[in-house]
Curated annotation (Swiss-Prot):
GO terms for biological process: leucyl-tRNA aminoacylation. This is Leucine--tRNA ligase. CDD domains: Anticodon_Ia_Leu_BEm, LeuRS_core. Pfam families: Anticodon_1, tRNA-synt_1, tRNA-synt_1_2, tRNA-synt_1g. It catalyses: tRNA(Leu) + L-leucine + ATP = L-leucyl-tRNA(Leu) + AMP + diphosphate. It comes from Synechococcus sp. (strain JA-3-3Ab) (Cyanobacteria bacterium Yellowstone A-Prime). GO terms for molecular function: aminoacyl-tRNA deacylase activity; ATP binding; leucine-tRNA ligase activity. ATP binds at residue 627. It is found in: Cytoplasm. A motif ('HIGH' region) lies at residues 43-53. One of its GO terms (cellular component) is cytosol. It is an enzyme of class 6 (ligase). Its EC number is 6.1.1.4. InterPro entries: aa-tRNA-synth_I_CS, aa-tRNA-synth_Ia, Leu-tRNA-ligase, Leu_tRNA-synth_edit, M/V/L/I-tRNA-synth_anticd-bd, Methionyl/Leucyl_tRNA_Synth, Rossmann-like_a/b/a_fold, tRNAsynth_Ia_anticodon-bd.
Length: 873
C-alpha cells in the first residue's frame, strides 16, 4: 500500500477490475431474492456531463451500492434518451448525420460515467434511437392504436412561412419569431397524431394517493396539471339555431351571463359571423393565430376581441346576449366557448369594461355596500348570496351540499337545461413531430383502406439514412419518395407511409420497463421478468420532469396493465427530485440581457469583482450552473484535480439531496483532506503489521472473547461505542437518504479512531474495518483499495453491510448537568445506573456546586434522573 493517496491511479485500476469481474452485473432473481430497482432518469446524449448529471447519478449510485451490501439483488441500469431536435440541428449546422453525432456523444458520456465509478450494469444499456429499441416503441404505438387510444385529427402547429416547416415551441422566441429564419410564426391546422391520455385522467388523479413515496410538491403539480373541475354542461342556442355548449364550474352565475365568447379557432365562428363583421373577424383570427397559448392566457395582458354580429339566447332567462370572439378563450380547453359573467369573473369583467358590455350582479357580497354592477371596481369572486337569479335567489354561494353550485346543477337537470359534468385541464397528448430524428410512426395511408397499421412482422419501420437535412420545406421524411411510397398491407394498392415521427417523450415513457429484459428480440419484455423487477423502487431525477415525463410514464404503465402485460399500475414507488447545482455568479446590474452575466473565468479578483469591459463593480449571487451565465464547473476538471471519490463526497456532503447545492472549491478541498486522513489512518494501521489480522484470525477472535468475558478496558468500551454508534447512525441516515449526515458520521468515527490511544487493540481493528465498509458506497474506489490493503480477498462491495451491537451502545457513564436557580453552572460524570439519591449527593459534592453555593444549603433540590440536578437557593 502506498503512503500517498493517488486517486487517478487507484480509480482507473479498480474501474478496469470491476468491469473484468462483472461486479455490477444484475443477478438472476430467485424465490429468495429481495429485489431493489434503482434508476436515475436517463440523459439526452449531449456529449458531456454537467454537475447536475453528476449529482443525480451519484445519489442513485450510493443507494444502489448500499442495497447490494445489504443483500438485495439490485438492478441499476443506464441508457440514452437519444432521439430529439438537438441532433437534427447539429446535422443541419455541422453537416453530420444525426446518428453519427448521437453515437459519438454517447461514447464520450459513457466514458465519463464510468470514470465516476457509477455501478451500472452496462450489459443492459439501451439507446432509444437504436432499431432494436424503437421497434418496440412502434409496437406499443400499434397496441395503443388497436385499443382506440391512438388517433389522428387536425390540430394547430407553429408554421414558419419562410422555411416552410413546422417548429417546436422551443424554436419560437418570445416575440413569436422563428429561431432560424426570423419570420413571424403562424398557426396552421395540420393532421396530427394523438394518444388518448384523457381516457385515464380519473385514474391518473385518483392513484396519486398511492404514491406515498413521492414528494408532496410533485403530487400537487400533477394534480393541478390533470386539473379536475366539477361543474355543468349547458347549451346556449344562437338565434339561427346553432348550439353552443359550454362547460362552467359556476352554473350558479348563469343569470349573470351577459355575453358569450368563442375561441377564434371555434368551428362555428365563420357561420356565426355576419357580413358586416366579416373583415374584422377575419383580421382578428389572423392576429390570434400568431400568438402562443401562453401569451394568450397571460392574465395581465390587455383584453382584445371582436363581435361576430350574432346573438345567443341565455337558456335560464331567455335574454338575448351577443357572441364575441377573443383570444383569451382557448379551443383546447373545455368546449372553446364560454358564458361571460363579468360581475363575477375578472377576465370577463376586464373584457366587458374594454368593450362597453353589460355587467349584471348576481352575487350579493356579505358585507353589503355593493347593490349594483356600477359599485364594482373589480369582479366579485367571493362569498355571498344569490340575487337576480330567479328560483335560486337567497341561496348562499359555495360548492358544498345545499349551496349555490349544487343547487344550480340540480335545477338545470330538473329543467332539462344542463347536466353535471367533470372536466379535466388535461388534454390528449399530441405526439406528431414533423422531424427526421425521431421514431417513425408505423402507419400507412391507403387511398382505398384509409389508415392502415404496419403489420407487426414488418417492424421496425427503419429511419432512412440517405436524408438531407436543411431545416426547410416541411417534414424531411415527406421528401423521400422512395421511402414514402409503399404497398398497402391490406389491399396491395399504392400507398404512402406516415411521415411524422413521434414525440421523444414516447421513448422515455416505457424505457424503465425494457431494462428488465433489454436484449429480448422476440417480445417487448418477458412478463415474468418485468413484473418481478418492477415497479422501480427508487427513481431519481430533476423537478423539471415532475409533470410531463412522470405523467406519461404513469399513463403508459396503466395502459400496459390493461393490455395484460403488467400486474402493477404505478411505475415508480419512491421518487427523489434532487436540487439544482448552483455556483457563484457575477452580473452587472447596469447591463441587460445576456450581456449582464459575466463569466467566472473573466473575473480577475473574486474579492473585488469588476466588469472586465467597464470596470464597474459586479454583484454576486448563487445561481444554477449554465452556459449562459458562464458559471459552470466542468466535472472533468474536478476528476483530474481530486478524483471521482472526492467529487462524490462533496456532492453528497454539501447539502441534503432535495435541496439546492452551492458549489464551493474550499469544501471540495475539505473532502479531499478527509479522504487523505482516512487513507493515512489505514496506512498506519497496515504498516504496523495488523492489517490482515484485522479481518481474519486473531484480532476478530480476541475481540469476541474479550466482549464475552467483559474484559474490555474503558478506552476499548468507549471506542467500541463510537464504532457501533457510527454503524447505527450511518445506516439510519442512508435509509432516509440523509447522505450529508451519514458522511458526518464517518468523520466522527475517524475522529474517534484518531483520539483512541489503543492502536493495537482488536477494537481499533474493528473500527478501521468498519470505517472502510461504511465508506464504500460513498467513495467506492478508495474503499476498495483500503479493503484490499486490510487483507480482503473479495471486493468490499460484496461484503455484508455492518450491523451494530445494541449492547455496545450502552454507556458506562452519563453526564449530569448542574444548575443553580435554573442556570447552567457545570456538569459531572456519574455511573450509568446512578440512582436519584446518589445523583443528588454527587451534584452537591461537585466542583460547580461548591463554587456557587459557598457553604449555603439549597432550599430545594430538583433531580431529573440521569440528566440534571437543579439547586434552588
Amino acid at each position: 500500500m502506498d503512503a500517498r493517496y493517488n486517486p487517478p491511479a487507484i480509480e482507473s485500476k479498480w474501474q478496469a477490475h470491476w468491469r473484468e469481474l462483472g461486479l455490477d452485473r444484475t443477478p438472476e432473481l430467485t424465490a429468495e431474492s429481495r429485489k431493489f430497482y434503482a434508476l436515475s432518469m436517463f440523459p439526452y446524449p449531449s456529449g458531456s456531463l454537467h454537475m447536475g448529471h453528476v449529482r443525480n447519478y451519484t445519489i442513485t449510485d450510493v443507494i444502489a451500492r448500499h442495497k447490494r451490501m445489504q443483500g438485495y439483488a439490485v438492478l441499476h441500469p443506464m441508457g440514452w434518451d437519444a432521439f430529439g431536435l438537438p441532433a437534427e440541428n447539429a446535422a443541419i449546422d455541422r453537416g453530420i448525420p444525426p446518428a453519427k453525432w448521437t453515437y459519438q456523444n454517447i461514447a464520450q458520456m459513457r466514458d465519463q460515467l464510468q470514470r465516476l465509478g457509477l455501478s451500472y450494469d452496462w450489459e443492459r444499456e439501451i439507446t432509444t434511437c437504436a432499431p432494436d429499441y424503437y421497434k418496440w416503441t412502434q409496437w406499443l404505438f400499434l397496441q395503443f392504436f388497436k385499443a382506440g387510444l391512438a388517433y389522428q385529427k387536425e390540430a394547430p402547429v407553429n408554421w414558419d412561412p419562410v422555411d416552410q416547416t413546422v417548429l417546436a415551441n422551443e424554436q419560437v422566441d418570445a416575440e413569436g419569431r422563428s429561431w432560424r429564419s426570423g419570420a413571424l410564426v403562424e398557426k396552421r391546422l395540420l393532421k396530427q397524431w394523438f394518444l388518448k391520455i384523457t381516457a385515464y385522467a380519473d385514474q391518473l388523479l385518483a392513484d396519486l394517493e398511492k404514491l406515498s413515496g413521492w414528494p408532496e410538491r410533485v403530487l400537487t403539480m400533477q394534480e393541478n396539471w390533470i386539473g379536475q373541475s366539477v361543474g355543468a354542461r349547458v347549451v346556449f342556442k344562437t338565434e339561427t339555431g346553432e348550439e353552443l355548449p359550454v362547460f362552467t364550474t359556476r352554473p350558479d352565475t348563469l343569470w349573470g351571463a351577459t355575453f358569450m365568447v368563442l375561441a377564434p379557432e371555434h368551428p362555428l365562428v365563420e357561420k356565426l359571423t355576419t357580413p358586416e363583421q366579416e373583415v374584422a373577424v377575419k383580421a382578428y383570427r389572423a392576429e390570434a393565430a400568431a400568438r402562443s397559448e401562453i401569451e394568450r392566457s397571460a392574465e395581465d395582458r390587455e383584453k382584445t376581441g371582436v363581435w361576430t354580429g350574432s346573438y345567443a339566447i341565455n337558456p335560464v332567462n331567455q335574454e338575448r346576449i351577443p357572441i364575441w370572439i377573443a383570444d383569451y378563450v382557448l379551443m383546447g380547453y373545455g368546449t372553446g366557448a364560454i358564458m361571460a359573467v363579468p360581475a363575477h369573473d375578472q377576465r370577463d369583467f376586464e373584457f366587458a369594461r374594454q368593450f362597453g358590455l353589460p355587467i349584471k350582479l348576481v352575487v350579493q357580497p356579505p358585507q353589503g355596500g355593493v347593490t349594483s354592477a356600477e359599485d364594482l371596481q373589480a369582479a366579485w369572486t367571493g362569498e355571498g348570496v344569490l340575487i337576480n337569479s330567479g328560483p335560486l335567489n337567497g341561496i348562499p354561494v359555495g360548492k358544498g351540499p345545499g349551496q349555490s353550485v349544487e343547487r344550480a346543477i340540480a335545477w338545470l337537470e330538473e329543467q332539462g337545461l344542463g347536466e353535471r359534468q367533470v372536466n379535466y385541464r388535461l388534454r390528449d397528448w399530441l405526439i406528431s413531430r414533423q422531424r427526421y430524428w425521431g421514431c417513425p410512426i408505423p402507419i400507412i395511408h391507403c387511398p382505398h383502406c384509409g389508415i392502415v397499421p404496419v403489420p407487426e412482422e414488418d417492424l421496425p419501420v427503419l429511419l432512412p439514412e440517405d436524408v438531407e437535412l436543411t431545416g426547410r420545406g416541411g417534414s424531411p421524411l415527406a421528401q423521400l419518395e422512395d421511402w414514402v411510397k409503399v404497398k398497402c398491407p391490406a389491399c396491395g394498392a399504392d400507398a404512402r407511409r406516415e411521415t411524422d415521427t413521434m414525440d421523444t417523450f414516447i421513448c422515455s415513457s416505457w424505457y424503465f420497463l425494457r431494462f428488465s429484459d433489454p436484449r429480448n428480440d422476440r417480445e417487448i419484455f418477458r412478463k415474468d421478468l418485468v413484473n418481478a423487477w418492477l415497479p422501480v423502487d427508487q427513481y431519481v431525477g430533476g423537478i423539471e420532469h415532475a409533470i410531463l415525463h412522470l405523467l406519461y410514464s404513469r399513463f403508459f404503465t396503466k395502459v400496459l396493465r390493461d393490455l395484460g402485460l403488467l400486474n402493477f399500475d404505478e411505475p415508480f414507488s419512491r421518487l427523489l427530485t434532487q436540487g439544482m447545482v448552483q455556483a457563484r455568479t457575477y452580473y452587472n446590474p447596469n447591463k441587460s440581457g445576456k450581456d449582464r452575466w459575466i463569466p467566472t473565468a473573466l473575473v480577475k479578483d473574486p474579492n473585488d469583482p469588476r466588469d472586465p469591459e467597464t470596470g464597474e463593480p459586479l454583484q454576486v449571487i448563487y445561481a444554477t450552473m449554465s452556459k449562459s451565465k458562464g458559471n459552470g464547473v466542468d466535472p472533468e476538471e474536478v476528476l483530474a484535480n481530486y478524483g471521482a471519490d472526492t467529487a462524490r463526497m462533496f456532492i453528497l456532503f454539501k447539502a441534503p439531496p432535495e435541496k439546492d447545492l452551492e458549489w464551493d472549491d474550499a469544501d471540495v478541498e475539505g473532502q479531499f483532506r478527509f479522504l487523505n486522513r482516512v487513507w493515512r489512518q489505514v496506512y498506519e494501521f497496515v504498516v504496523r503489521g495488523s492489517g490482515t489480522e484485522s479481518l481474519q484470525g486473531k484480532a476478530a477472535e480476541l475481540l469476541q472473547a474479550k466482549v464475552e468475558a467483559g474484559s474490555l478496558t474503558k478506552a476499548e468500551r468507549d471506542l467500541r461505542r463510537a464504532v457501533h454508534t457510527a454503524i447505527k447512525e450511518v445506516s439510519e441516515d442512508l435509509e432516509e437518504y440523509q447522505f450529508n449526515t451519514a458522511i458526518a458520521g464517518l468523520m466522527k468515527l475517524s475522529n474517534a479512531l484518531a483520539e483512541a490511544e489503543i492502536p493495537d487493540s482488536p477494537v481499533y481493528a474493528e473500527g478501521i474495518r468498519t470505517l472502510v465498509l461504511l465508506l464504500a458506497p460513498f467513495a467506492p474506489h478508495m474503499a476498495e483499495e483500503l479493503w484490499q490493503a486490510l487483507g480482503g480477498t473479495d471486493s468490499v462491495h460484496r461484503q455484508a453491510w455492518p450491523t451494530y451491537d445494541p449492547a455496545a451502545l450502552v454507556a458506562d457513564t452519563v453526564t449530569i448537568v448542574v444548575q443553580v436557580n435554573g442556570k447552567l453552572r457545570g456538569s459531572f460524570e456519574a455511573p450509568a445506573d446512578v440512582t436519584p439519591q446518589e445523583q443528588e449527593r454527587l451534584a452537591l459534592q461537585s466542583e460547580a456546586a461548591q463554587r456557587y453555593l459557598q457553604g449555603m444549603t439549597p432550599k430545594r433540590v430538583i433531580v431529573v434522573p440521569k440528566k440534571l440536578v437543579n439547586l434552588v437557593v
